Amino acid sequence: MGGKGDDRMGDTLWGYIVRTAARITERAFEGIGTLREWCDERDTRKREFMQMMGLEPMPERCDLDPITLGDFSGRGYRVEKVAYRILPDVWGSAHIYRPDPMPEGKSPAILYLCGHKPIGTHGYQQHGIMWARRGYICLLFDTIEQGDNPGDHHGLYYGRRFDWISLGYTPAGGELWNSIRALDLLLSLPEVDRDRVGATGISGGGAHSLFLAVADERVKAVASVAGTDSIETLVGHRHVWGHCDCMMPFNIYRRDTSELFALIAPRPLLLCFAIHDSLYTPAGWRGMYERIRKIYELYGKPDKCRLFEYPGPHSYQPETIEAISKWFDEHLAGEERPMIGLGEEEHEERTTTVFNGAPPEPDRLCLLPELKTRRGRVRLPSSLDEWEEAKKELRRRLLEAPLNWIERSEERLSMEMIGDYMEGERRHLVYKGEIEGVEVWLELITPKEPMGELVLAVLNPGESVREVMGRVGGWYPYAVFEPRGAGLSAPDPSNAIDFRHLVRSALWVGLTWTTIAIHDILKAIRFLRGEFEWRRIFLYGKGDAGVACVYAAALDEEVGGVVADSIPTTHLEGGHIIGILKVLDIPQALGMVAPRYLGLVNFGPYRSLWTERLYDRLGIRDRLFIGGLREAVGRMIGMGSRGA
């Protein structure tokens, strides 16, 4: 565990996130070299994708109940304006463009996924017109937050919905569900040939045409325009700053974009990119394409995956439209059809609007994060044996998804002792360490004749080592630990824009600060046990650091107890871990400390009193203390010395 750190020592948390993104891309498809190896992994990877999208398990499909709310037409096409249900009391809106006159028999169809133009389908009407004039049925639908649809794609982007992290809700998943339901609507049309349906779009629509094709194999061919990049360049080149929250899943399984979109294989996939697009990097998308194409080569179908590059900014060019048209003609229509370029908008907003500014009532689309999230439930036990079994299952579920990186982590803690001195009757040992190039710090203070118990106090972001020493220090042995992202390596939340995008970038590599802190605390505990013969180690933390201490104790049952100071009463308010609320909330996490000692300082009121009821049921109410810090720590040390 000893030894000096490498020459990256003192790197920032941002630098660590960037290197993590690069490593994810570098390790893409590791261990996969044959079609058998890919097929053996494919179902697992698709399930992981759906879980990262918040769609595992899938919501129940309700009846679409489509309602026609008007129509309009032009030369060679007619358009039906439709409202339909995404979920009960949650409405979507769409335009169905049909050729006029309609050809005989069933027709190929295009699901056009809109990007981020403010008035949704209105701004993309040229695409519906073009496809209808080329003999395709084309359905355009409004995204969440666009047109007349309520809801939010920018909750994290603007820093107003950090609770999405703990809910495990990403607008990428909300929009994917919206896309699946739009596909349901398209396939419900009797004139559509279900075996000849393609998906396309630009920007956010380019990303979601890919996401939809991964999730739903009813999509038979894809043409994505300016939709994505490698994880390495999306994060490392700060493209996250320019992207909506709907552009990536919460990447807890650490998959490069190429690994996600290779799940489309062997269906036809066209990737189109503008050379001068400010939101992406040519080296990133080219590498992504080459990695995806290797999977197509394993299927013996490299011609089904193609990259089309063209000059210009983040937009279509005439040659892009031609390439996409030829792609779908080949793979859906089965024949080459006359080329028709994109024209101008032909209809005013007052004509194209589906809801005329007011969706049907009731409409709960603004509640989609809550409606789509299945909250975990933990029953109160009737005995300690029952609770021990329940904790085993909770640990399994925690390590399966929200905290799975912690179990798989290959990151190492290196420590170097840089100070050993006496201050009165106390010995001070100072350690400078690093994990993946980011500095960590540990100061250990022991009496002249140390006891067998140690309190390990963990810094919260915004705290200093000296501040925590002054708050926690006492007659007992204690150590103060500065994990990554706290103390001197903490990002500055007063720089609100960059702080938000750092948080979002971390999510794109599957991390939150609380998750990193849990990982680092467990490493520090192992170091202290290896270097010294502490009979028992207790944990103390304030705020999110207190939450991290609770989870560290939940995962390491040799931890003697926890004092959690000023922690939130629910993960909706803080201590964010991706998707943690699908397993449990903070009162249940506190319960996982039982039957060990738990001290709660400045713990806000909450109505269920779940943790107190648990300790009462287990007959150990004396091991739960709610009150001041000094007494909470003193009781913990006292119980430790009695062997409780």
Language-model segments: which ranges?
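Alpha/beta-hydrolase-fold catalytic nucleophile elbow
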Residues: 142, 200, 225-226, 272, ...
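Alpha-helix capping and helix-loop boundary segments enriched in small/acidic/polar residues
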Residues: 118-126, 163-177, 199-210, 247-260, ...
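Structural beta-sheet core signal
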Residues: 199, 271, 457, 480, ...
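Primarily recognizes the serine-hydrolase "nucleophile elbow" in alpha/beta-hydrolase
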Residues: 134, 182-253, 524-592
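Accessory cap/linker subdomain of secreted extracellular hydrolases
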Residues: 42, 145-149, 154-185, 202, ...
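Aromatic-residue-lined binding/catalytic grooves and analogous aromatic/hydrophobic interfacial grooves
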Residues: 99
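Alpha/beta-hydrolase-fold serine-hydrolase catalytic core, especially in secreted/extracellular enzymes
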Residues: 1-91, 102-105, 259, 265, ...
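Cap/lid segment of the alpha/beta-hydrolase catalytic domain
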Residues: 103-188, 194, 228-240, 246, ...
